């Protein structure tokens, strides 16, 4: 996340990089992040899987007009940034990126989307709360059982139906919408760097990419 914040701070100096950090994040990481320009740290309690929804509520901040959501274990790179620029230059309500065959399993990848506040009819916090509360209704036919994919299930159930007709979609595989609904990628994949590629560290601390494009 530290490297991501440095890259984004340099590329989008007028944007705010809002990082949601639970209480178990090491103090030295918090210190380094807090010193990076444009970074705003939001400390949240440890809530397990439910923490994955915290970042979606950035759109509710009074001074946020457009939100882009990214995972901490993926790098922003030229291909991803070009997609962001396409959305910023459009008038679409929601931005969706799918850049791997596994991404076709979900209408919206939880760490690869964006949203304009002007398209919202109610706060994101209210939408999230309503969806989570379904799991507390005994025998509700849409009962929610939280797991590590719950954020993507939420986006499929509660967000995609609202905005799919107003979406700018970059999709390399193209299984979920007709080709005419898709926007082509302007930057080719280089060095395995597709949008959403996961970075890991080996035992010596060297960084490597996890998946083939």
For each predicted feature, which ranges?
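Short aromatic/hydrophobic "clamp" motif used to bind/position activated sugar donors
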Residues: 67
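Conserved hydrophobic/aromatic beta-strand scaffold that supports enzyme active sites
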Residues: 58, 94-96, 112-114, 154
């Amino acid at each position: 996340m530290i490297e991501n914040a440095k890259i984004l701070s340099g590329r989008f100096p007028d944007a705010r990089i809002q990082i949601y950090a639970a209480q178990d994040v090491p103090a030295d990481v918090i210190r380094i992040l807090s010193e990076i320009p444009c970074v705003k740290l939001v400390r949240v309690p440890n809530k397990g899987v439910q923490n994955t929804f915290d970042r979606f509520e950035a759109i509710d901040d009074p001074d946020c007009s457009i939100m882009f959501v990214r995972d901490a274990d993926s790098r922003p790179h030229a291909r991803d940034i070009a997609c962001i620029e396409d959305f910023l230059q459009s008038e679409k309500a929601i931005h969706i990126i799918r850049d791997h065959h596994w991404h076709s399993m979900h209408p919206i990848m939880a760490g690869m989307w964006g949203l304009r506040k002007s398209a919202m009819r109610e706060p994101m916090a209210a939408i999230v709360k309503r969806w989570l509360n379904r799991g507390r209704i005994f025998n509700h036919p849409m009962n929610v059982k939280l797991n590590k994919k719950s954020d993507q299930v939420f986006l499929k159930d509660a967000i995609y139906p609202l905005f799919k007709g107003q979406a700018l979609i970059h999709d390399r595989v193209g299984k979920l919408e007709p080709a005419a609904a898709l926007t082509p990628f302007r930057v080719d994949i280089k060095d395995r760097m597709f949008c959403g590629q996961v970075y890991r560290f080996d035992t010596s601390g060297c960084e490597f990419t996890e998946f083939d494009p």
